[in-house]
Amino acid sequence: SYMVTLKTPSGEQKVEVSPDSYILDAAEEAGVDLPYSCRAGSCSSCAGKVESGTVDQSDQSFLDDDQMDSGFVLTCVAYATSDCTIVTHQEENLY
């Protein structure tokens, strides 16, 4: 599994995420309260920004290439592919 550091407005949380778990799901199981809405990768409620490390969010359908290249990630459909650090609650910074 990978160690994902979530930088939330209420502080930093470290969550262990297995390769087959979405980051949002693993965070919830660990008791970390992250925003979400559709849980299907088709809105921006759960958006975060990857500061370091890598993720696979091929299931998402909302972000464009520029947003993904900038590091934005939809945590509800993102798998960690390495240890990574993600800033959460980034929806308002997408636009």
Swiss-Prot record:
Keyword match Aminoacyl-tRNA synthetase: no
Cofactor(s) needed by this chain: [2Fe-2S] cluster
Source species, domain of life: Eukaryota
Cofactor note: Binds 1 [2Fe-2S] cluster.
Subcellular location: Plastid, Chloroplast
Residue ranges of every copy of the 2Fe-2S ferredoxin-type domain listed in the record: 2-92
Main location: plastid
InterPro entries listed in its UniProt record: 2Fe-2S_ferredoxin-like_sf (IPR036010), 2Fe-2S_ferredoxin-type (IPR001041), 2Fe2S_fd_BS (IPR006058), Beta-grasp_dom_sf (IPR012675), Fd_pln (IPR010241)
GO cellular component: a single term: chloroplast
A molecular function GO annotation: electron transfer activity
Pfam annotation, one family: Fer2
Chain sites annotated for binding [2Fe-2S] cluster: C38, C43, C46, C76
Gene Ontology biological process terms in this record: electron transport chain
Keywords (A to Z) from UniProt: 2Fe-2S, Chloroplast, Electron transport, Iron, Iron-sulfur, Metal-binding, Plastid, Transport
Similarity annotation: Belongs to the 2Fe2S plant-type ferredoxin family.
NCBIfam families registered for this protein in UniProt: fdx_plant
Function per UniProt: Ferredoxins are iron-sulfur proteins that transfer electrons in a wide variety of metabolic reactions.
Name the record gives this protein: Ferredoxin-1
